[in-house]
């Protein structure tokens, strides 16, 4: 069957701490404009959970859209309570992880509701070898239930390790996912110089998604060419060691040979106010906007 229109649902568009920032709001006299705006009806789009998206993919099977979650961080469960309930999303066909930071993996334990509640026997997790090893070390019971303590009720996962340098298929879903390796700061090994820390973006059909990066290698940029929808990291206006600034994101998009029809920034800090950013980005040559939690964008596979 012909594949149809698929949807990307923004589960979260904020940095690791999310927005609003509790330390801003507990000041005797709060002054953070973004955090204060998030408490008002007109500023509600400033409420941001950890960066994550849900892809609802029409793979041409004639069945329901396949639900593919990208990242399952600290705010996953509260985000799911909001967006899964609103859109009647139950089954998770796949979870793909970009990297091993807390805002990408620390909500995985909450996936137990899907497997302990007999909604599905297991959840398929797609990740790099590095991310798998971090999960194995940090949450050993997720990898082997024999490591469980207490009552022993733990989520059931089916891990699939993919290579960062070649496309991979998802079980029972007729689509290909292309990893987009990008730099996301550095890490340190004692006695050695700092090493580049790689995070994965992903291309699915005509949509490329990069949630965390400070540099896109030429080989990755080439894989993104031809994307009509591009979601890209843009933490704030000022430079930052592990994330694109607004200027860097703009310059990267401008460097693409094929101009995307739609660009969305994501991963904001509380230095970024949504309504002001809409106006700021509206003057760019390439149609660009700040994504917000709950926003839905169409793409094609």
UniProtKB/Swiss-Prot annotation:
Record bears the keyword Lyase: no
Keywords: Cytoplasm, Hydrolase, Nucleus
Disulfide bonds: none
InterPro entries: Metallo-B-lactamas, RibonucZ/Hydroxyglut_hydro
One MF annotation (Gene Ontology) recorded for this entry: hydrolase activity
Main location: cytoplasm
UniProt KW Nucleus keyword: yes
GO cellular component: cytosol; nucleus
Entry protein name: Putative hydrolase C777.06c
Species of provenance: Schizosaccharomyces pombe (strain 972 / ATCC 24843)
């Amino acid at each position: 069957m012909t594949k149809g229109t698929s949807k990307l649902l923004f589960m979260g568009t904020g940095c690791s701490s999310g927005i609003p920032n509790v330390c801003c709001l507990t000041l005797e006299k709060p002054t953070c404009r973004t955090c204060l705006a998030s408490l008002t009806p007109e500023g509600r789009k400033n409420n941001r959970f950890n960066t994550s998206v849900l892809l609802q993919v029409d793979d041409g099977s004639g069945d329901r859209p396949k639900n593919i979650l990208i990242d399952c961080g600290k705010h996953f469960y509260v985000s799911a309570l909001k967006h899964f309930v609103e859109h009647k999303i139950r089954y998770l066909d796949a979870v793909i992880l970009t990297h091993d930071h807390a805002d990408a993996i620390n909500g995985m334990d909450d996936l137990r509701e899907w497997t302990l509640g007999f909604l599905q026997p297991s959840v398929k997790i797609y990740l790099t070898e590095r991310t798998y090893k971090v999960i194995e070390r940090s949450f050993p019971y997720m990898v082997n239930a024999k490591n469980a303590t207490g009552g022993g009720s733990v989520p059931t996962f089916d891990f699939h390790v993919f290579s960062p340098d070649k496309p991979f298929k998802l079980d029972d879903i007729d689509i290909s996912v292309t990893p987009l390796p990008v730099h996301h700061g550095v890490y340190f090994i004692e006695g050695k110089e700092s090493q580049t820390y790689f995070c994965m973006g992903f291309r699915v059909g005509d949509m490329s998604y990069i949630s965390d990066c400070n540099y896109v290698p030429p080989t990755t940029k080439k894989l993104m060419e031809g994307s009509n929808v591009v979601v890209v990291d843009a933490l704030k206006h000022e430079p930052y060691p592990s994330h694109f600034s607004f200027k860097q994101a703009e310059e990267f998009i401008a460097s693409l040979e094929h101009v995307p029809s739609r660009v969305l920034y994501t991963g904001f800090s509380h230095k970024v106010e949504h309504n002001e950013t809409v106006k700021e980005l509206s003057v760019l040559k390439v149609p660009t906007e700040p994504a917000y939690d709950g926003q839905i964008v169409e793409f094609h596979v």
